[in-house]
């Protein structure tokens, strides 16, 4: 009888232990979350790998800082030069491209800067620089903010030169869009977050489709040589899932307003 009770107790203990999913901390860019894609795929990863993913939703700059400090086990971000520098410094062994979408310029329906007629992105930003219209910037060192600054640099323009019309908000994509709505302003946004955003006000997409608006997302596992406590084996499984056929199907099938907003391109 005692032996049977002992066996039952051990089985119950084993079951309870296995039911406690391993927790993994993943820093992700706010556009990945605000677009709704995280809610679309994270539950599948957790179920398939029997883990509990704790998402830390921040801009790319902050995500990289969390990775550098060893506060997360992996990051999913979208600023290739910074990612490559991150790997070069030894904070990650590699970067793995997973998917992409595109940026768009959103602005007032009347399009006072007339960027919708621009032949390319640089002409669109040149029109914005001359029109003295409100422009909201993320201003948070996120991937989107860095893309915006990259474009201003390409036309040799310092956006602060337009004074109070240039509104730097230091906020995530969703909050920045809300501020753009309030100021009837232009803003650079990833297309998925814009389409998924409920409060569009008087704004609409005014320019899209230029190759410079390509927005690549990559997965970077934190290097255990830099931070021995990271859960590198579990992170390796997450990376394997993210490049799987199931991931391809889920990412490519994610639609907003009947539009495919992300494209899988992992290799």
Over which residues does each language-model region extend?
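Bacterial N-terminal signal peptides
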Residues: 4-15
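Sec/Tat signal peptide C-region and signal peptidase I cleavage site
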Residues: 17-21
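Exported/periplasmic ABC-transporter solute-binding proteins
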Residues: 22-50, 61, 65-71, 80, ...
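Hydrophobic anchor at the start of a short beta-strand
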Residues: 53
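Acidic, polar ligand-binding/catalytic clefts
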Residues: 74-100
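Serine endopeptidase catalytic core focused on the charge-relay Asp
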Residues: 105
């Amino acid at each position: 009888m005692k032996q049977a009770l002992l066996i039952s107790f051990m089985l119950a203990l084993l079951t309870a232990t296995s039911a406690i999913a391993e927790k993994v901390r993943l820093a992700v860019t706010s556009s990945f979350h605000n677009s709704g894609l995280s809610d679309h795929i994270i539950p599948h990863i957790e179920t398939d790998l029997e883990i509990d993913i704790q998402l830390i939703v921040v801009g790319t700059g902050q995500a990289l800082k969390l990775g550098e400090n060893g506060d997360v086990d992996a990051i999913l971000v979208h600023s290739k030069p910074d990612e490559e520098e991150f790997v070069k410094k030894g904070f990650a062994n590699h970067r793995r491209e997973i998917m992409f979408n595109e940026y768009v310029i959103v602005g007032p329906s009347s399009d006072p800067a007339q960027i919708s007629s621009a032949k390319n992105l640089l002409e669109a930003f040149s029109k914005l620089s001359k029109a003295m219209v409100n422009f909201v910037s993320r201003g948070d060192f996120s991937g989107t903010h860095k893309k915006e600054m990259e474009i201003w640099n390409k036309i040799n323009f310092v956006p602060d030169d337009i004074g109070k019309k240039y509104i730097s908000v230091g906020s995530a994509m969703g909050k920045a869009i809300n501020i753009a709505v309030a100021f009837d302003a232009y803003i650079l946004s990833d297309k998925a977050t814009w389409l998924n955003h409920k409060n569009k006000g008087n704004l609409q997409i005014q320019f899209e489709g230029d190759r410079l608006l390509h927005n690549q997302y990559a997965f970077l596992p934190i290097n255990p040589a830099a931070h021995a406590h990271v859960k590198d084996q579990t992170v390796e499984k997450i990376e394997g899932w993210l490049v799987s056929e199931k991931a391809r199907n889920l990412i490519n099938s994610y639609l907003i307003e009947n539009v495919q907003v992300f494209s899988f391109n992992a290799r």
